[in-house]
Regions:
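K/E-rich alpha-helical interaction surfaces of small helical-bundle regulatory domains
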Residues: 130-138
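Alpha-helical transmembrane spans
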Residues: 36-102
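A generic structural signal for beta-strand entry/edge sites
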Residues: 2, 114, 139-141
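N-terminal membrane-targeting/pre-transmembrane regions
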Residues: 1-51
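Structured extramembrane domains adjacent to transmembrane segments
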Residues: 128-129, 145
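Conserved beta-hairpin
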Residues: 85-126, 134
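A membrane-cytosol interface segment of integral membrane proteins
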Residues: 141-189
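Short beta-strand segments
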Residues: 3, 125-127, 150-152
Length: 189
């Protein structure tokens, strides 16, 4: 017996932003699964604004006092920082736009062996329960993290079905919720 969840592939902007933020913070969650999900878009935008202010400050100071080594270094560091963070923000926005435009059907099948993710005309992922490091409940998705860089997310509207299936079949997986949620082992009753 297995649990099959089908989706038309049309999700909200907030859902995809959360999934992208989870993907970009994967390594941080693997080190500390309970950590709070940070909004990378906002953080990067604020950092870029600060770098632009410092760049402007460096250029103005350079014109007023002359371009000394310190000001030139400040300008170069700001330009490099703006380039790196600008590229990261562009990549994240591109991933969001691509996700919003992708209307392919998605099927997630959960059984005693593990989780199978299939996207119509495309990606197939198989994750065995022994590979699942933990599952984490976020505001929009329930996400399964593996040690080998695979992340499979299920819309939170299916959380109860998934958790009931895991409990009923005695599958051992550590589940971590949003802040305030008590960490449980889903296979134990």
């Amino acid at each position: 017996m297995s649990l099959t969840i089908e989706s038309d592939g049309k999700g909200s902007r907030e859902l995809y932003e959360e999934q992208i933020n989870i993907s970009y913070q994967y390594k941080l969650f693997m080190k500390r699964p309970e950590r709070k999900l940070r909004n990378q878009y906002r953080r990067i935008t604020i950092d870029l604004a600060a770098a632009l202010v410092f760049l402007l400050f460096g250029i103005i100071e350079g014109f007023v006092y002359g371009f000394e080594t310190v000001f030139v270094m400040l300008i170069v560091v700001c330009i490099v920082f703006i380039g790196i963070y600008g590229r990261l923000l562009y990549t994240m926005r591109k991933a969001l736009r691509k996700a919003l435009e992708d209307n392919r059907k998605v099927v997630v099948c959960i059984d005693e062996e593990g989780i199978k993710y299939h996207k119509e005309d495309g990606m197939d992922l198989n994750l065995k329960w022994s590979q699942v490091a933990f599952a984490r409940v976020f505001s929009k998705v329930l996400t399964f993290f593996s040690d080998d860089n695979i992340v499979i997310s299920v819309n939170r509207t299916h959380e109860k079905e998934v958790m009931d299936y895991i409990r009923e079949n005695g599958i051992k997986v550590r589940v971590i919720g949003e802040p305030g949620f008590v960490s449980v082992s889903a296979g134990e009753q």
